[in-house]
């Protein structure tokens, strides 16, 4: 009986997705509070700053598989802990 119970527990653990899922902020505002659960393959939070037509800097936040390269007139910050892209 104990063996059967142990087997069921092991099978349950293997079948469940017990992997860690990262959360990142996804809104463009300065005081961003909107949290998004990233897909399993997205392990990076990104915050991009870019110059919006000489009207000042804007931020774009989200999840990514890898840290993107910065484009001209853009700064990219990457991190890998929950909600680290504030």
UniProtKB/Swiss-Prot annotation:
PROSITE patterns xrefs: SNAKE_TOXIN
Coarse class of the protein's main subcellular location: secreted
GO CC annotation, single: extracellular region
Record-linked Gene3D superfamilies: CD59
One Pfam family this sequence matches: Toxin_cobra-type
Keywords: Acetylcholine receptor inhibiting toxin, Disulfide bond, Ion channel impairing toxin, Neurotoxin, Postsynaptic neurotoxin, Secreted, Signal, Toxin
Tissue: Expressed by the venom gland.
Compartment list: Secreted
GO molecular function, one term: toxin activity
UniProt keyword Disulfide bond, yes or no: yes
Source species, domain of life: Eukaryota
Record flagged with keyword Chaperone: no
Disulfide linkage: 24-45, 27-32, 38-63, 67-78, 79-84
SUPFAM superfamilies per record: Snake toxin-like
Signal sequence interval, chain numbering: 1-23
Family the UniProt entry places it in: Belongs to the three-finger toxin family. Ancestral subfamily. Orphan group II sub-subfamily.
Physiological role: Binds with low affinity to muscular (alpha-1-beta-1-delta-epsilon/CHRNA1-CHRNB1-CHRND-CHRNE) and very low affinity to neuronal (alpha-7/CHRNA7) nicotinic acetylcholine receptor (nAChR).
Protein name stated in the entry: Weak toxin 3
């Amino acid at each position: 009986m104990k063996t059967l119970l142990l087997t069921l527990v092991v099978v349950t653990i293997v079948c469940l997705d017990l992997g860690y899922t990262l959360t990142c902020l996804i809104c463009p505002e300065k005081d961003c509070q909107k949290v998004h659960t990233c897909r399993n393959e997205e392990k990076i939070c990104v915050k991009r700053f870019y110059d919006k037509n000489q009207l000042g800097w804007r931020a774009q936040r989200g999840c990514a598989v890898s840290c993107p390269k910065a484009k001209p007139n853009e700064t990219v910050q990457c991190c890998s802990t929950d909600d680290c892209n504030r």
